[in-house]
């Protein structure tokens, strides 16, 4: 979430897998390549692109982010990567781009890919409707961000980091929300996303084995019960996540995870704590649902 976008494209093109669970359902499933390309940070192309790909959950995608493709030389490098993916996969890569410069966009579109231009169609339609031609420059989305919005965002991120994983509890009175759940249930990334995207001051606290089997909240949480929000995650999924961190341990065993899951659901019910099953949700979906369920108002955005 806090990745800084370098203006060197080679530092941003390491692939990641989206819809990874589709591979566990079908080992013979072909992994499809997808590229998010922009002459700016590529945040918009990546955010919209990943949202669209999430609608095809049965297809695993190997994704690459190529920001700052703002010269013909960099466009040619992007074309080479797309063509290489096509030769390797035998399938046209999906190419999501938000390139404003028509010459650079045309070069990228010359690659052997399924081009999904996110700007051209929209900009043309808006120009037709308003009678005003676009200025053709990238990056204006951030021109009018005022200093107060920036400060709110940074303050919220600092709060999330300072109050991560139950490290500090004395500032919980300043929190907008306190996420709770078992270890590795998605509390930290959700807290950071709430801070970064909405300016929400989110703390998070892991309920330990002792907390769970006492069937009561720790004292530091009882005092702020009205701010608590619980995360739940499917037992099978949580076992896989914990195995990646500590394979073969009691911590990652099915029996241990199942016991923790039952115990924490009991606490949520007995204490009247609102909760959400996040097993098949992206962090964006989790954060949005939390705002919807709690009525929290975003400070920015």
Residue ranges and their predicted role:
Residues 5-6, 17-52:
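N-terminal accessory targeting/assembly segments
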Residues 38-40, 68-69, 97-101, 280:
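Structural motif
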Residues 65-82, 95-98:
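Metallocofactor- and cofactor-centric catalytic cores in central/energy metabolism, strongly enriched
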Residues 115-165:
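Hydrophobic alpha-helical segments and helix pairs
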Residues 141, 224-260:
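A glycine- and Lys/Arg-enriched "phosphate-lid" helix/loop adjacent to the NTP-binding pocket
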Residues 152-201:
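Internal active-site segments that recognize and position negatively charged phosphoryl groups
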Residues 160-167, 244, 251-286:
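Small-molecule kinase domains that catalyze NTP-dependent phosphoryl transfer to phosphate-bearing small molecules
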Residues 202-213:
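Short beta-strand-centered segment that lines the nucleotide-binding/catalytic pocket of NTP-utilizing
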């Amino acid at each position: 979430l806090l990745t800084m976008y370098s203006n060197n494209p080679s530092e941003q093109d390491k692939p990641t897998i989206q819809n990874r669970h589709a591979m566990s359902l079908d080992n013979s499933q072909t992994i499809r390549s997808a590229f998010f390309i922009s002459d700016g940070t590529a945040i918009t192309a990546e955010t919209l692109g990943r949202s669209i790909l999430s609608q095809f959950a049965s297809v695993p995608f190997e994704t690459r982010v190529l920001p700052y493709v703002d010269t013909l030389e960099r466009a040619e490098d992007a074309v080479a990567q797309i063509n290489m993916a096509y030769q390797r996969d035998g399938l046209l890569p999906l190419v999501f781009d938000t390139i404003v410069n028509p010459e650079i966009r045309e070069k990228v579109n010359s690659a052997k890919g399924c081009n999904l231009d996110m700007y051209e169609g929209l900009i043309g339609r808006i120009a037709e409707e308003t009678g005003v031609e676009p200025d053709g420059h990238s990056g204006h989305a951030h021109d009018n961000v005022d200093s107060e919005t920036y400060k709110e965002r940074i303050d919220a991120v600092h709060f999330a980091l300072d109050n991560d994983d139950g490290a500090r509890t004395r500032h919980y009175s300043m929190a907008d929300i306190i996420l709770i759940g078992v270890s590795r249930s998605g509390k930290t990334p959700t807290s950071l996303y709430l801070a970064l995207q909405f300016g929400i001051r989110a703390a998070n606290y892991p309920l330990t084995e002792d907390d769970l089997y006492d069937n009561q909240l720790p004292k530091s949480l009882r005092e702020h019960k009205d701010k608590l929000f619980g995360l739940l995650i499917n037992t099978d999924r949580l076992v896989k996540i914990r195995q990646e961190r500590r394979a073969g341990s009691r911590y990652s065993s099915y029996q241990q995870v199942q016991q923790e899951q039952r115990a924490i659901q009991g606490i949520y019910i007995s204490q009247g704590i609102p909760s959400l099953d996040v097993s098949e949700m992206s962090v964006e979906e989790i954060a949005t649902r939390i705002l919807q369920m709690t009525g929290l108002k975003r400070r920015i955005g």
